[in-house]
């Protein structure tokens, strides 16, 4: 009798494990595919940058940026290939987030007019992700070299990112198509890039104007202050900007420490952009999962929309 009970318990346990695998196992495999490619690409990019950092580049032969002479950042300028290591390596946090966005743009494309544009068209997610990758690589290059070219590449990434936030909000407000969005995006970013080459000192003001304009559009679009993701992203960005000011004014400054205010600014800004992306995804009806049942066998999970 005890053996029969034990055998029944084992069968019941195996049945429940089968149900759990059918319910969560395939979902886990799908999520693993989503993160595997970005993780592999991130490892390749970091390995390439580590290899570059082992080489001795003569940065002094390049035209140096104004930040080198004015000592804008708190971190001590070191000799070698990486002049500001903590500010440089903290910039790489933008890269995995951008790669994840670009990968998700391919996997999560759902053709439904009820969803937000960033879910209906993969070009939005791709452009958002690529701008973050360029921001990370450009910021690393700038803090590693402190050269004029490095500053230019760094600001290009900032304009790509700020231009996307501004143009995406404007396209949703005006109900533009994806093609019109790309045209407006190019009309916003290209003049800023050309202006940056001739007037590099105005970059922070132009980038600040883009961010403030994007925030104003989001608040006026559908009262985004009621959305928790938007509020947390806004608070995170504000905290990062406050720490950046303290670092620049040397009020929060330890030159030889691993704790750098500008590095914290990089991390908080990357978190704010990730929250902004999740906020964009939260627009429209939620996409949920359910298990299909057919002929005594659990089938692949299907999507359905629920407000």
Could you tell me what each predicted segment is?
Residues 2-3:
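Short, low-complexity, Lys/Arg-enriched N-terminal segments of secretory-pathway carbohydrate enzymes
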Residues 7-8, 12-182, 187-201, 224-307:
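Early transmembrane hairpin module of multi-pass membrane proteins
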Residues 205-224:
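Active-site rim beta-loop-alpha module in soluble metabolic enzymes
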